[in-house]
Amino acid sequence: MKSLMSLTTIFLLISQFSVLADDNLIEKTCKQTPFYDLCVATLQNDSRSTSGNVPALGGIMVDAVAVKATELLHHIQELLKGTTDPKVKRSLKECASIYHAVRDADVPQATQAFAFGNYKFAEQAMNDAANEADTCQSKFVRSPLTVSNKNEHDLATVAASIAKFLL
């Protein structure tokens, strides 16, 4: 019984140190990015961040970019159904095309680049995704996507910063 309690205590201590190490890696990595709070929140909300390596954290950020691009595409489709203004429709369709490119080209390129250690390509792909969010925003006089475009831009910028940190 005494040895079981000792083993349990040791296990709990190791678990605590592991969590602290993961948080330290996240904090150290996120300090290298321009959006520290977004970086920390995104990584701490993903159980894969306990992997203990920076390239995996970059991959998690790329996945967050993909999720946001997909959410934006769904939101754009809903907005298209609800608008009759031809200028707004045209801009929304252009943004849909942009976010298809982010999801179907930039994200896979960055994912593969992080996986194979080609961090310059990961940085370029995520910088492209950030620029695409800005391009979408510029299509409108008053954008219905401002908050989402900014979030996508910031997530992609964090992912690009992590890739740059690895160079």
Language-model regions, residue ranges each:
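Terminal membrane/secretory targeting segments in land-plant proteins
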Residues: 1-24
